[in-house]
Amino acid sequence: MAVFKGEVTALPPDKSISHRAALIGSLSEGVTEITNFSAGFDNQSTLGVLHDAGIEVSQHEIDGAYGRRIRKVIISSRGLWSFTAPEKPLMCNNSGSTMRMFAGILAAQPFESELVGDSSLMKRPMKRVADPLRQMGAGVDLSPAGTAPVRIRGTRDLTPLEYRLPVPSAQVKSLVTFAALHADGETRIIESIRSRNHTELMLGLETIDRPDGERVIVIPGRKTIVARSFYIPADPSAACFIVALGLLGSNSEIIIRDVCLNPTRVEFIPLLTGAGADITIENSRIIGGETIGDILVRSTRTLKPLVISNPTVVAGVIDELPMLSVLSAFSSGEFELHNAEELRTKESDRINAIVVNLERLGFDCEQYPDGFRVIGRRCRPVGQVTVACFDDHRIAMSFAVAARATGEGIALSDSDVVGVSFPNFFEIIENLKA
């Protein structure tokens, strides 16, 4: 077993906050400065569509903490209606976040536009994007299969509404919020199961917690958004891979600096500590409305099996489920997941991708429509096994962590895909080897 020790100070900036900071900047009057913006492919796609829709965007490197070079993005805008009709379809590449959230802004612009992506994104469902925007008065056309291209006939006359989220989705919540900022009146979004709340925090929106557990987000329409500065903390979803590496490694101790600790983003930590993981939070503080701190992880080779079925918990760890399932399988030999149909509509069908690869590695699995089970029996294969990445960065990194930590002969079909969210993933792992 490999040993990993050291300090991680170059974790990728948070993807979710980077997307939202850029989009909010495009709606703000004045100059928005975003420090420590993500260099990942997805976030660069957001900057690309903003530029192609007429927003002035620039980025350059500056000196950051711990002797690092970091990215600073500057966005200049005149406010809510600063966009111009694009001359060609807006390319979102592999970024579903870009396509879904930017659709909310384009719905309020007085021109026609089209959002497209790579072959993977063009297969992902977009009906949940179209439905609320149509209710608000925008024209939205999809393919016969309900996928991209997303063709939008925008209007300055969007109607405010009360919208109940049909599924817990921070992206849908955000796209409705961005559209509602342009509507003539107050929009209310109701969520029964909480999802990440960065958009509400960054816009300073009023939220109402009902006695029945539902939350209402109140969005006033046509209010001036004044440009401000944003600092992007380290991505907790990326931190989860390093946490798993430390837990699976032998006699390992890793500290991960300046991670976003927003409670809606780090629900994987109480799950793991409840299973016996040695994880500690240090140096917690508030910056720009977000909780930021350091994560200290020490080897915990044998964890209690993870069983995840509560819909609220599933929604809270949806991005971390590939890593959590692989970690639990290699640590305890067991894992069980239910109520996670959403995983089938990500960059890949992640339920199938995880099961296929675990079975290649000798695990006995059962697959369900909404999840799967690792049963606890393993016949370890002889020789090297190549796991399929399915063009999915989280699948690739989850099995890469298992390979590096256990020393087993596991190869990846496509390691370059990690650049979508974590360009320096392999470099960090190599630097942590003791």
UniProtKB/Swiss-Prot annotation:
Amino-acid biosynthesis: present as a keyword of the record? yes
Q: Where do the coiled-coil regions begin and end?
A: none
Write the record's keywords in alphabetical order, separated by commas.
Amino-acid biosynthesis, Aromatic amino acid biosynthesis, Cytoplasm, Transferase
Q: How does it assemble?
A: Monomer.
The record, for PROSITE patterns, names: EPSP_SYNTHASE_2
Tell me where in or outside the cell this protein is found.
Answer: Cytoplasm
Name any Gene Ontology BP term. chorismate biosynthetic process
Q: What does this protein do?
A: Catalyzes the transfer of the enolpyruvyl moiety of phosphoenolpyruvate (PEP) to the 5-hydroxyl of shikimate-3-phosphate (S3P) to produce enolpyruvyl shikimate-3-phosphate and inorganic phosphate.
Please indicate which superkingdom the organism of origin belongs to.
Bacteria
Q: In which pathway does it act?
A: Metabolic intermediate biosynthesis; chorismate biosynthesis; chorismate from D-erythrose 4-phosphate and phosphoenolpyruvate: step 6/7
- Where 3-phosphoshikimate binds, per the record, is at 15-16, 20, 169, 171, 195, 319, 346
Provenance organism: Chlorobium limicola (strain DSM 245 / NBRC 103803 / 6330)
Q: Does the keyword Transcription apply?
A: no
Q: Output this protein's name.
A: 3-phosphoshikimate 1-carboxyvinyltransferase
What family classification does the UniProt entry report for this protein? Answer: Belongs to the EPSP synthase family.
This entry carries the following GO cellular component terms, namely:
cytoplasm
Record-listed E.C. numbers: 2.5.1.19
Residue positions of the active site: 319 (proton acceptor)
